[in-house]
Amino acid sequence: MSEKFSLWLRCLHWVNFPALAIMIWSGILIYWAHDVYPGFFPDWFYEKFKIDHRLAQGMAMHFTIGWIFTLNGLLYALYLGVSGHWRELFPTLQNFRDVVPTILHDLKLRREKPRQGKFNAVQKIAYTGALLLGSLGVLSGFAIYKPVQLSGLVRLLGGYQMARGVHFAVMVAFILFFILHVVQVIRSGWNHFRAMVAGFEVEDDDAGS
């Protein structure tokens, strides 16, 4: 067995996973009350999941879990810096060149496995992108929550309506990331999932021979 993820990283991940899910769900409850992009979510979607007329519930959940999501994100950023984990996570120029070969290998269209360390090129870009998305989501969220007190931030984001658009785009991007992440976890098998739970991954005996 080899250590894959530290205890700190696992704890932060398993706090972030449900927090992000609740933030997305409560965000949709809030969005229903002011559908600025009509038709993006069809009526059957609202009816199926009973989303209509739940603005107060959505706001209560969003503002409560939002603080947990933000604090967890700050702790994660601190962990990256203190532990040096950022060196394994942040992509290099070579990683961007390896994106296509990595995807082709993942789809079984390329036999040769691209170079990689703890994370492959696509994982590095996706996880770093998620970190940037989270930061943008928090900033745009504060901008539309306190537009008068944080008028400078609102202007930086292009105005109130633009800040709302950015916040909505972040939510959609996180939904896509969420789906792809779960699919990849399922595809990678139990060994990788166990590593995020227990911290260790079982290696094949042939791997080192």
PLM features: residue spans?
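Membrane-embedded alpha-helical bundles that constitute the cytochrome b-like, heme-associated redox core
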Residues: M1-S209
